[in-house]
């Protein structure tokens, strides 16, 4: 299987890619802009693996995403790219809106256009997983509180609102 991972140089994305490369036969294309949150050193242990590929790409760049989809031909997309620091989102929400909302839309459109060109059997199998954050549910008020699948969104920062 071919898996396109956005934000793969980030904390969670790099753990996902290391797991895929170390525990499956799947091939990965890691798309990451390499901002303050991205660090290719977190992928050093797999950097020589021929199933691990990297592209320094901004998910807001539709042409670069279209090329990545057409060249790599993924079966699955795992979308983890995001601006992710709550305090930074309060000080300057524009980058969070740009990456987390507009970038996600651009990625979805690139995936949709790619999907439209797939044969029926590949269309049926194609998946896009958007990995978000528990912050979209707001704050827990006690140690006994839990979020469930039925918990309503209640974001409390520009970051969590941009991921809802």
Curated annotation (Swiss-Prot):
It comes from the Bacteria. InterPro entries: NAD(P)-bd_dom (IPR016040), NAD(P)-bd_dom_sf (IPR036291). Pfam families: GDP_Man_Dehyd. Substrate binds at residue 133. PANTHER family: DTDP-D-GLUCOSE 4,6-DEHYDRATASE-RELATED. Belongs to the NAD(P)-dependent epimerase/dehydratase family. This is Uncharacterized protein in galE 3'region.
């Amino acid at each position: 299987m071919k898996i396109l991972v956005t934000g793969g140089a980030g904390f969670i994305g790099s753990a996902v890619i290391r797991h895929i490369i170390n525990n499956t036969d799947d091939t990965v294309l890691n798309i990451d802009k390499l901002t303050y949150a991205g660090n290719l050193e977190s992928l050093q242990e797999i950097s020589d693996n021929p199933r691990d590929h990297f592209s320094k790409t901004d998910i807001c760049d539709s042409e670069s995403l279209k090329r990545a989809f057409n060249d790599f031909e993924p079966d699955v997309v795992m979308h983890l790219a995001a601006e992710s620091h709550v305090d930074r989102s309060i000080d300057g929400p524009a980058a969070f809106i740009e990456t987390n909302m507009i970038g996600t839309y651009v990625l979805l459109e690139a995936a949709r256009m790619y999907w439209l060109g797939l044969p029926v059997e590949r269309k049926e199998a194609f998946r896009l997983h958007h990995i978000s954050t528990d912050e979209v549910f707001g704050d827990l008020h006690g140690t006994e509180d839990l979020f469930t699948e039925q918990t309503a969104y209640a974001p409390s920062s520009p970051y969590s609102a941009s991921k809802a």
